[in-house]
Amino acid sequence: MSNIDWFKESLSIQPVSRYVEVQGKKIHYLVWGSEEKPGLFFIHGYSAHAHWWDFVAPAFIDKYCAVAIDLSGSGESDHRDHYSQEIFADEIKAVCTDMNWKQADFISHSMGGSISLNATSIYPDLFNSLTLLDSIVVLPPDKVRNFSSNKSMIRADFIYDDKDAAMSSFRLIPP
């Protein structure tokens, strides 16, 4: 198979378009593959939409039923006057409920990753696994304090009680 054949083959597999209502707004999502298989849920990033997964999702349909959502305000979903992490979590849950999924594996890109991370705290039983692609992960301050330059290459935003405490912890790297 040439470098472009797999891409053309993926795009030739057309998804089924569906809608579910969440808090009075229509939320659009796409479905590829047999609904008898385990769920694989794709969540797009900022300024994106469900069709960004058109060439990716078909690669998984031998083992999964793949779904990609248009979060509210994106793609074919309705727009809202107000958006929140909780509303996005409810949209994810509603699609899973519509698909009759009690649990699914999730792959999320960019802003979709932070939305998914938040959704895991609201609907933890829904997530069998979560894969983040190019997403920012913000750790709670109590977890960040355990890192040091000797243990991790993670750049963390530390929270200090005052300016003097912050300045006293400043170190040049490398020393």
Features from the language model and the residues they span:
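An N-terminal hydrophobic leader/cap segment in hydrolases
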Residues: 1-19
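Structural signature of beta-strand start/N-cap positions in the alpha/beta core
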Residues: 39, 63-65, 100-105, 126-129
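Conserved catalytic-core motifs of eukaryotic protein kinase domains, centered on the activation segment
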Residues: 52-54, 77-83, 141-144
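Flexible "cap/lid" loop of the alpha/beta hydrolase fold
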Residues: 117-121, 128-163
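Short, hydrophobic alpha-helix immediately C-terminal to the catalytic nucleophile
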Residues: 54, 93, 117-121
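Conserved HGGG/HGGXW glycine-rich cap/lid loop of the alpha/beta-hydrolase fold
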Residues: 25-76
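Active-site loop/oxyanion-hole signature of alpha/beta-hydrolase fold enzymes
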Residues: 20-25, 30-32, 67-107, 111
